Amino acid sequence: KGGLLVFAAGAALLVARGLFASPLVGVRLDGAGTLRFGVNAAIVAGAVALIAFVWSLLAVPRDLEARAYYELAFWGGGHVLQFAWTLLLLVAWLLLADASGVRVPISPRVVALLFGIQLLAVFATTLVYLAYDVTSVEHHRLQTWLMRIGGALAIPVIAAAVALGLARRVRGGPVPAQARPLLAALVVSL
């Protein structure tokens, strides 16, 4: 139990720092602004995940068998946390692509829209928590559905765009020595 509290405190401090120190997206939605939006969306997802964890821990009956207790206690928050990780992964792909000279054939607005859909799914989690008990089948099904719809939409689109840009970059001639490690990291992360 103590380890979970230390982990939760660390996560809460990280999210709080992110919320108070996150860079502004800006008025003009260019590539950098879109990436800032993605990072900010991940921070918000982390905050909602922490709220979901606390809510679930308070709502799940303590007299359940240990496996059932922990599954119910961490189901909703865990799904929301996956949104944060996915957003950060997508931002990392786009950053690595840019840093290694890969031109990704997708507009910043489309990427921002995909990030926004994930953020809407994160906010929909609060509706699931308000509408259904944490121990209900509906709660679990809707959390899974949110991951399938909101979470899975951006991954193939951005991965395909990065892969296409990567293929074009590799065919375009030799890669500068300083970009090779970044390009390798991008390739193995896809």
Name what the model sees in each region:
Residues 1-190:
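Hydrophobic alpha-helical transmembrane segments of multi-pass integral membrane proteins
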